[in-house]
Amino acid sequence: MEWTRSGEDLFVRIDPGEEIHATLQALADEVGFDAAAITSGIGRTRDTLYGYMNEDGVYIRRNLDSPSELVSLSGNIARTQDGKAFTHIHCCWSDDDNNV
């Protein structure tokens, strides 16, 4: 991961092979912030595991088996009651046939 600061904003590049949640949680610890808005993210992902809450309130995890284009990423970072960084992220992907 590489990052730079411009005023109060951080710009982050996540390196190939780094996991998005873990990398952003590590950034929160490195920089020392308690809360942040994630306003935008794009790029190419592979070996993607994502999850969602179904209509019965059950959290379902699924894999995207092929590399995909991350066309939108947003969310937030906050601290849990025990002080650990927690990420809540929403994403949209596109396959190589432009299906989102």
Predicted feature residues:
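N-terminal intrinsically disordered, cationic/polar leader segments
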Residues: 1-100
